[in-house]
Amino acid sequence: MTTREGSLEAPTRHPLDWRNPEFYDHAALEAEQERVFEICHGCRRCVSLCGAFPTLFDLIDEGKSGEIDGVAKADYGRVVDQCYLCDLCYMTKCPYVPPHPWNVDFPHLMLRAKAVKFQDDGASFRDRLLTGTDRLGRLATIPVIVNMVNKANATPAVRGVMEKALGVAAAARLPRYAEHPLRANVERSVAWPVRDGGRTPGKVAVFATCYVNYNEPAIGHDLLKLLAHNEIPYRFAEQEACCGMPKLELGDLATVEQLKNVNIPPLAALARDGYAILTPVPSCTLMFKQELPLLFPDDEDVKAVADAMFDPFEYFVLRDKDGLLRRDFSQPLGKVSYHIPCHARGQNVGQKTREALQWVPGTEVNTVERCAGHDGTWGVKAEFFAESMRIGKPVFNRMAEDDPDYVSSDCPIAGRRILQGIEDKSGPSRARKEHPLTLLRIAYGIE
């Protein structure tokens, strides 16, 4: 039977067999890399997505044979280093994903290579620091320390030293740390009656995320205000650690499991008690919806959490379809340039944020669906910063079109990178960077 390009069946994804000793076998890994790279070489649809594919194709084209057998196995790592696990090749481009018999899952092959590298070599101090978001946040928000950290991160001379000593790009804008983390300053929910809809549970558990908790708690407070405005009772889990996505991108799967063991039991209890679980950062949502179930396919608690997990705007749009969301918007937003992050696209729920913003009268939404180049910790590393800005340049240009009133992305770090890209080119922008949850709060006229 002839193997055809593409498939008439819906894409599926196999669990990651990361506990199998063969997963870490160098020869087995290199054989699978060679097989997949050969398929990618014959296709090349993903060349515009990230640096991994141009790096691979340059290695092949500049090799002695012009084929994958002309590429030294030692150079495979150069491809792996350029992959930041955005998942767009798998989700939007590749015609050979399962159930196609060629069974190509490029991101998870790169994850396997990162896991092997981590097992062999560990990680640098810089990478351990950047991916320890929860620990870093707890330390940086200590009252005596937080102002010193923020001042240091905004001082060019200090940033120059940080680049030389740690490898954190001096030119990359870093987020401020909050004096009052979200989880320590939560508005208590009113005990509204629970109104379940056909598509949505009527009560919400919020997973704060490291970034919103320690860096931009206002985003979390705005989410709570939106829930309160719509009389949806909410609460937080009793305990919370990092979702594990930064450690996943590092290949540190053992720490991913440790974090899972902290987060999943309380979240699973909430899921089984009928709560929808909302996370205001797409990478965290994707971690619970997709990556943890693929890493721990036999864990029923992980499955329960995945089934209860919603992107906030996915929840609000479905709540609206249930006839249980208010549309009493009083403030137009004007021109909004809205960016759809990679990890929001990877959830396959459609453009729910754009749909919700378009509910607001007097609002024009310019939607940009392309990688902004920040990609977790990857885009602040000195060796990748210039490449990350190059990847984001088309997004920066399109987001600046029509002189917007707001620049917005579901991913807060992508939003910051976009505004930096705009201002690096054209100087200070009149556009305000605001999260879509903040925009909806403004549109409701909520203070």
Language-model features: where?
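Conserved oxyanion/phosphate-binding beta-strand-loop segments in alpha/beta enzyme cores
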Residues: T2-A10, V47-A52, P181-D196
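Cysteine-centered iron-sulfur cluster-binding motifs in ferredoxin-type domains/subunits
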Residues: Q33-F53, D75-V104, A113, G137-P143, ...
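Non-heme iron-sulfur electron-transfer modules
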Residues: E5-F23, S48-Y84, Y96-R126, P428-L439
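Short, intrinsically disordered, charge-biased short linear motifs at domain edges
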Residues: Y24-E38, I68-C83, A228-N230, L357-W359
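Generic start-of-chain signal for non-secretory N-termini
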Residues: M1-E38, E447
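A generic structural-conservation signal
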Residues: L49, L59, T92-K93, F236, ...
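Iron-sulfur cluster-binding electron-transfer modules in prokaryotic oxidoreductases
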Residues: V104-E447
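A structural signal for alpha-helical segments
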Residues: A28-A31, V71-A74, P101, G251, ...
